[in-house]
Amino acid sequence: MNKVFNLNTLALSFLVPSSIICAAKCDNKNANNSYLEKIASRLVIEPTELIDFKSTDPKNVISKLNVENLPLGYEISYIEIKPNGSVIYSLHKTGSDQEPQTFEYKIREDAVAIDKNTRLVYKKDSYYSSLEGLNGKTLFDELLKLQQSKIRGIKTYAYLYNVYKDAFLDKYYEKDNTILDIYSENPKGQDPYYFTYEFHEGKDADGSSGKSRSKSGEGSKYNREHIVPQSWFGKVEPTRNDAHFIFPTDKIVNNERGNYPHYIVKNPTFISRNGTKVDKTNGICEPIDEFKGDVARAYFYFVVTHNNSSSNDLFESSFPYITKKYLEVYKKWSNQDNVDAFDIDRNNAIARHYNGLRNPFSDYPELIDLIWFKTDSKFHNKGIAIAIK
């Protein structure tokens, strides 16, 4: 019994495989009610948001249930909401004297939710449970505490290359599984050059030395680009080894960028072959539009995870920890370049390598507003983002 759901009609909807749907008849007093059984077998009862059935008042659960495939002229009444996610309900024909029939519908405990506003698909998970109901500085402080409890999973500097084999593959543009380099990728046409894994600088964690193309300029090899430069935090470990903000990029462009922060460049002194701009006069670098959100979310990640930079230009020593001009531009970049499949896949791949450590802004881009822009909204845990719908 395979169901096809119209997810555009839902706010936060559970994807429930038909194999776990239980529309079992609990009371079969009248054999003439076989049609009710047929209706019940087709019903889809879904929460309109992620619900913890064990701790939520059943009355509140009922208000958050949506029913699909109920024929015109029939109605249901809820009898009981069980802590295991079972919904007991009666089904009957409207205005009929026929005795209602009782059925049970079981919702899988680890169901997946879809956020209508961002189109992110979430898997139920407790990673962010400690942030529930928080915002502002309180949310920041709790998130920093959470992230710093996870950084022990970060591995060595050489191991960054091993992470890149999983987390930074081009499955989205040329789809050729080459290394996805934000300083050379051309999202609107042919890449000026590309890197397969082995063209890295130095050795990986397996002791394998990288290769180099015999050419000058861009395209010879890639290395490890710290979005937040190492000199800003004294190269301390494990910070300098964290792939969530250290990307594989062309060595030449990396060198041209140096230790400049990313910002808006009006008068570039260098432009890479994919359009990345560097202004050495003012000491800033601007990525192409396609990756501005990725870069911005890497900076936000650094602040809520490591928060140990001594840079006096971009970072501050007290909340909000990012100077106003950068905070506003990075928010704009994140909004313009929304979380996409590259963000989601990268976040989950790195988490697998780092014993679960995640970039919260790839899971919840709204954290930028919830922490720094004083909205009335509060954080709600939907789990971890696993896909784009």
Predicted regions and their residues:
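Beta-rich interaction/scaffold domains
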Residues: M1-I114
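Short, charged N-terminal helix-start/capping segments
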Residues: N28-A40, Q147-G153, K215-F233
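Non-membrane alpha-helical secondary structure
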Residues: A31-Y35, D57, K123, L131-G136, ...
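Short, surface-exposed loop and linker segments with low hydrophobicity and enrichment for Pro/Ser/Thr
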Residues: Y78-N84, V163-I179, P287-R297
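Short acidic, gly/pro-rich beta-turn/loop elements at beta-sheet edges
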Residues: E99-Q101, P192, Y260, I371
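N-terminal module-boundary/linker segments of secreted carbohydrate-active enzymes
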Residues: D110-P192, L367-K389
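Short, His- and charge-rich active-site/binding loops that engage polyanionic ligands
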Residues: N186-K215, S220-K221
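Domain-level detector of nuclease and nuclease-like folds
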Residues: G210-K389
